[in-house]
Amino acid sequence: MVRAAFAFALCLLAFHAYALAKDPGKVELTQNWALSSAKDLQADGATISQSSYQEKGWHPIHRMPATVLEILQEDGVYPDLYVGKNMLEKVPQDLFRQDWWYRTEFTAPAGFSNYSLEFPGINYRAEIWINGQKVADNKQIVGMYVAHQLDVTKWIHPGSSNVLAVKVTPEQLIQDVDGVELADSWFDWLNWKYLGYQGKFTKTPQFGASYVPDRNAGIWKPVYLRATGPVAVENPVVNTDLSMPQATARLTVYANLHNFLEKPVSGTLKGTISRFGKQTIDLEQGVTLSPGETREVAFAPDQFQTLIVKNPDLWWPYTMGDPSLYDLRLEFVADQKSSDQAHIRFGIRSVTQHRDQDQEFQDKGKGGNFYLQVNGRDFLVRGADYTPDMLFKYDPDREAAILKYVKDLGLNMLRSESKISSEHLAELADEQGIPLVFGWMCCNQWEKWDQWNEEDHRVAPESVRSQILMLRGHASSFIWANGSDGLPPLPIRTEYRKVISELHWQNAVVDTVSSFAKDDKGERVWDGIIMEGPYSWRPPSYWFAGKYVTTRGSSAEQGDNEHIPTLESLKKFIPADKLWPINDTWYLHAGAIADANTLGSVQRAVDHRYGPSDNVEEFVLKAQLAHYENTRAQFEDYAASGWANHKMTMYWMLNSHWPSFYGNIIDYYLSPGGSYYGAKKGLRPMSVVFDAYATGDHSQARIIVFNQTPSDVQGLHVRVRVYDLSGKVIDDHSVEGVQVTFNGANQVLRLPRYPQASSVFFVRCQLFDNMGKQLVDNVYWQSQKDDDVGGPQNDDALNLKQDKWADMTALNTMPKVELEVNAEQTVVYGDRVNIIRLHNPSSHIAFFERASICSTRDGNEILPVEYDDNYVTVFPGETVEIHGAVSIKTDPKWVKLEGFNTPATAVRIE
């Protein structure tokens, strides 16, 4: 990659069109790009890729990578496509029916013998031209998930200007209509009634085909130029064979060496493994490469004893320990000159997959529930499904903010169903200790195997190869899924697994994450993971009842597909004249499945339980209540069930791909609402929970303490109080000396029914450690009337059906309370931390109080933001503190407070 650091530094002075990548000699081409529709141009690639060509009428690209529609929007061709119906009404829906040219000029560094271009992601086909020469055609450059590396040495102009032109052909085919191309799909994440295929041909897709107007065409991952000597060092990885509890690691280092020359090259591959405070490991071996040869070279512990490491600093998921990382540096030296270098960060850890002995799901196939062990310890998974932006906008700061939210919530795994963006997310996850799951998208191209042609059968394993090579070295990469809802046919999954094995993938592999898959003989097959939802709102008692298959085992996805964001967020994408009543502008931003596409389930849940709303403000507030109690109960039940009954869940979904009502915990604008704080409460490492009278004859409610920390705990104190709506305490219980093993749960109390209480009453559960410090204050609102979804046969995964409904409408008549509020600010670890105090001087309860930190009295909340708690309840005579942290770059001046039975107020931060 680079011969000498000094020479490379000199090149930096002249090289104006790139940003320095993490490896010497590898530079990211980020600047001087422009875009044009091919139909608007007469010139061909040979002309466009010359420095004399004039870019008249081209659209400047503000930051690469970028897809076509993102570029056009950024250049003002279209208004904000995420507002109202703009995506449907303000942009031609057939942008994908034309080719698009990307063009850039850059100066290549001088002093190197070989140059390569790397394209990790082009969607879908492309011609590559440089300096008037075609480097590759659109039969070679095919596949959204295929990475391409092109030797451009003979066409590059070292030390002077070069022109790169890429002609992109978008995905053209429509599944179930005229075939497939192995790009990506938004499936029901977009409402295909509005966005996508509208039945203009004689055939119609089985479900529907949703897509944005350009079908996410373009260069959607970074483009790199690599400058090297005669031999390149590629795709390094370090694998770990870990013995526990002795804590001895046998490391194996792999890397590919490629000889660009037409003659043999002999040299030395040198390596170092280092970590601050640990002894550095030095490696070295001689290598001779044949002309044009690419060879995998390994440093194995049997030959290199220093690769047997005792008591290493292990990489752990952040919920289990520290995510310790080591550095590997490799260098190939020939003729006493550095030909190329490579650097990666890796973790010493083991990830193994297992099946338990549970026979509850024999109808799904053979074997028990899937689970993971990390470094020999059981890993309790509490995850969520992640999505990038709908236009695949490249935004590292946004990714960092989302991962910060993940840790604030207490989630410990993210799943990507295709949509595998750049390595930046994995690099952050390595550092933060957040495990990741990757695999192919359900239902459309990747699972329409009977519609694949010869090209698809070539592109599929090439795509697997490209993604595994990118992901395999990351400590955060835990699971690869060859299929989602379906099971690839035997020849295809055999090919996938062959590639995965060849590339030394040292993590878990599953062929499906569904419990409905069948093999080639028509027999049910599963990998121990269920995928049965629900995908719509459920009452708290549903999760604790113990009679629904969805609440046990290991689940790949389950959550609420109809999520109402905060009012501030809603107003950002729904125009003022479309805010109320709910209408088709809302539906455009919903999912596609029937009932969800009109937000039917969430409206039923809110209206039946909290009463019909007269305006959008009332509806949104009630929806936050519903989201809070549902999401909290979902995570609390998993914890209260203990390791034996529930080993893995993924919430559907973590975040939003655009401003949407499709399921999420964090909305598109990164505003945390009711679902967020319900999830955060349910994901506490230790907590005390109330099961909503869900079991038996419903005459008693269980109070359960769970422990999801890495250690056993003892000496806990539980206090449970019951309040009526007026604020009067009608029952008070305490339990001392509670102990719980890690990943365990203990029932500590049973509460009777309280017929003497109001029609809705509050159950307050507090947990204290052995020093009397409060760990949790968990407040529930419970109706005298129970929710009842009915028997398992009535449980429709995709929409809400209930035989009986709780009546929460008495909450609307709670006595009004005025809180005394003040706020002050300090700086902690580079964040502005605002301490907000809510004091209740009255004899009544102040319910569901949400604080928002703002720059101005009437401004929107500063985002992203991290509160230790929100939507809090303040009991009579008590004071609650909320700590809210925002970036040091922001200017917080005000706190706004809104509650269910308190007037909205704003106070200045002192």
Regions found by a protein language model. Give the residues of each.
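Accessory beta-strand-rich segments of carbohydrate-active enzymes
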Residues: 34-40, 59, 72, 92-233, ...
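Low-complexity, Pro/Ser/Thr- and charge-rich linker/hinge segments at domain boundaries
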Residues: 27, 185-200, 230-236, 349-370, ...
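Carbohydrate-binding surfaces of carbohydrate-active enzymes
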Residues: 255-262, 582-870, 874-884, 893-894
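Extended carbohydrate-recognition surfaces in non-catalytic/accessory domains of CAZymes
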Residues: 20-118, 198-222, 226-231, 356-358, ...
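Extended acidic/polar, glycine-enriched regions
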Residues: 154-161, 254-358
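Short acidic/polar inter-strand loop motif in beta-rich domains
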Residues: 169-176, 333-339, 767-776, 902-906
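Substrate-binding/catalytic cleft of secreted carbohydrate-active enzymes
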Residues: 400, 413-596, 609, 622, ...
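Active-site-adjacent substrate/metal-binding segments within catalytic domains
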Residues: 65-107, 112-119, 123-131, 135-145, ...
